[in-house]
């Protein structure tokens, strides 16, 4: 009863070793409920899953069963869109846990610092960066191998392409990208790993015939480090979703199209404020007008790369890379006598007139004499 009589409530709380906030809480209970209010009270949430109407619980379970690989947050967002109001996320989690419809969440690996041709920046708008890869192959129910090509807009998470390919050759992948560019326009950059046909792991700046074509279209190249898939972590997450939700099962193109439709137009994403990718993505303003016959270099000397990857300079054949065969490069004179070698907006290296050699931009000077020409 001292709490009702003291003039120094703070000192009284210190005497009993409790905070002032706790002291006021107990005094309020005493004034409101008498001695009965001093008993320990239940800590269960006031809005508990047990208090939800049976129809609400059934609808939660039904939505989860229709989207088995979605978490409670996405299921709640879907419920909210359908009914206009929804219980708390924790209520959804408890209901789905009791129904045995949840799985432990895996810890994400931290993204590491990326390597060559990597800007270090993430897309801030649609079409700034597209990501591409081949989903690891599996066999469908008919025993046929399926290895889809996946293309994704980094900012909006919009899956631009999920295509079962006849093979992974350059010609097949280029034809797929030509159709994609015609539909969606051109991105600012394309991020890939260092595998074929997107890159040549030992070639000049990793250039392949496919990525050289991208550069000719004015598209920048971004790549992760060899052996570090987390450098393209968002795309790897997409592949985990595909593996979980589509394998094993039909690998027909119709099934892939249905999955892409749901992912883009129905599935909410936390990183997008629970919006769907289709609500964020829009076509590129850079239209695709076909492949250029060649590149022009105003103010530079142009040299066509031959079938063996060489150019002629001062009567001397210099090996550049066979990935650029048929394309022209630009030679820009420097004040020290050297010449920069450019392909589009990509600096390839330098011609040193004193040694009559080409110095690659991706090899340190001390390594130049130790490397043999590659693609």
Predicted regions: what they are:
Residues 264-375:
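C-terminal, beta-rich DNA-binding module of retroviral/retroelements integrases
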Residues 1-31:
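Double-stranded DNA-binding cores of transcription factors and transposases
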Residues 209-289, 330, 334-335:
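Charged alpha-helix within mobile-element recombinases
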Residues 180-204, 225-227, 232, 274-277:
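Acidic/histidine-rich, metal-coordinating catalytic segments
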Residues 85, 94-158, 166-188, 215-216, ...:
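Mobile-element integrase/transposase regions
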């Amino acid at each position: 009863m001292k709490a009702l009589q003291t003039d120094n409530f703070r000192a009284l709380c210190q005497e009993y070793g409790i905070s002032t906030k706790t002291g006021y809480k107990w005094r309020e209970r005493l004034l409101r409920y008498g001695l009965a209010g001093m008993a320990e009270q239940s800590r269960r949430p006031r809005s508990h899953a047990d208090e939800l109407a049976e129809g609400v619980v059934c609808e939660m379970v039904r939505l989860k069963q229709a989207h088995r690989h979605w978490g409670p947050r996405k299921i709640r967002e879907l419920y909210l869109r359908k009914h206009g109001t929804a219980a708390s996320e924790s209520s959804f989690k408890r209901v789905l846990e009791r129904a045995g419809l949840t799985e432990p969440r895996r810890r994400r690996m931290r993204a590491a610092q990326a390597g060559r041709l990597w800007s270090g920046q993430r897309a801030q708008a649609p079409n700034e960066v597209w990501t591409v890869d081949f989903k690891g192959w599996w066999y469908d129910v008919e025993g046929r191998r399926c290895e889809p090509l996946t293309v994704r807009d980094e900012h909006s998470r919009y899956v631009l392409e999920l295509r079962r390919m006849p093979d992974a050759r350059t010609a097949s992948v280029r034809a797929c990208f030509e159709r994609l560019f015609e539909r969606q326009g051109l991105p600012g950059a394309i991020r890939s790993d260092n595998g074929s046909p997107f890159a040549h792991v030992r070639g000049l700046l990793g250039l392949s015939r496919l990525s050289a074509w991208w550069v000719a279209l004015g598209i920048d190249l971004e790549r992760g480090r060899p052996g570090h898939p987390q450098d393209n972590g968002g795309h790897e997450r997409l592949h985990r979703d595909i593996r979980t939700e589509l394998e094993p099962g039909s690998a027909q193109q119709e099934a892939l199209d249905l999955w892409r439709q749901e992912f883009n137009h129905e599935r909410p994403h936390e990183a997008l404020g629970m919006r769907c990718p289709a609500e964020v993505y829009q076509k590129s303003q850079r239209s695709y007008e076909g492949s250029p016959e060649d590149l022009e270099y105003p103010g530079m000397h142009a040299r066509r790369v031959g079938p063996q990857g060489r150019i002629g300079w001062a009567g001397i054949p210099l090996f550049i890379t066979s990935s650029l065969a048929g394309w022209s490069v630009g030679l820009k004179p420097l004040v020290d006598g050297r010449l920069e070698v450019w392909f589009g907006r990509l600096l390839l290296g330098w011609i040193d007139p004193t040694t009559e050699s080409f110095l690659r931009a991706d090899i340190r000077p001390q390594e130049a004499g130790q490397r043999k020409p590659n693609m």
